[in-house]
Amino acid sequence: MSGPPSGPATIGIAGCGTMGLPMAECLLAAGVDVWGHDVRKVDEFGAFAPRMIADAGDFAARCDIVLSVVRDLRQTEDLCFGDQGILRRDGRPDLFVTCSTLSPRAVADLAARMPDGVDFADAPMSGAPYRAARGTLTFMVGGAEATVGRLMPLFQIMGDGIHHLGPVGSGMTCKVLNNFVGVVGVVAVRKALASAQALGLDRRRLLDVMAMSSGATWYGDNIDAIDWSRQGYDPGNTIGIIEKDVKAYLDALDGGGGVFETALLDELRTLEPLDLEPGPQS
């Protein structure tokens, strides 16, 4: 996390949910002229409410750069070209960045449809809301050198691991591969915890041992910090969203998954809410 960018650009965060809102708050705290937009009512955003713009046209006209942190491709389409349509207006940003996890194929399609005068980059992030609030996200970025250079001061405020991986689509390709491994970790840890309970082993002791052994995973190591770590599967929650991430990975392979990927999705959908007492530092 570093100081504000030197340029005068006005930044918009579209989709001020569990990731987008703390990202916007980090930028504001660093002195960035940042505004938010969301389909929810402005008064739901607490101290950030004065920086929220409810009307999509007003939001598009105010912002030079828009970072999209909406849930999925359907919401991205609506934001860009649908009812909200910030990119089909005369007053619109000159740089649009998708930070949502989409498929690389969807990113290529979005890039091809950018209006004249609108640059594009993909910059999905990893780290969960607690790291978004700390400004320590990891960004995986795809785009032209000049475009990414313009964005880099913003990423350095919101993150401490910024990786420019190549042209448009490279960031998303890395993200879906990373998330595929992450989902494997979620399912494996939850299965191990269920087995430990069935076998009479203290689950906290198991987590402690795995954290310093070959069973270490991002999910297991951060289970008390991750806000969704105890969720059961529901299409509307974060566990449901990571099902979409596996499907984005499969889409990148032209649907070429096999038995393992099918079993992973099946196991993910069976996850029940986790009843685990908080750890000593949580």
Model-derived features with residue positions:
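Rossmann-fold dinucleotide-binding core
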Residues: 100-179
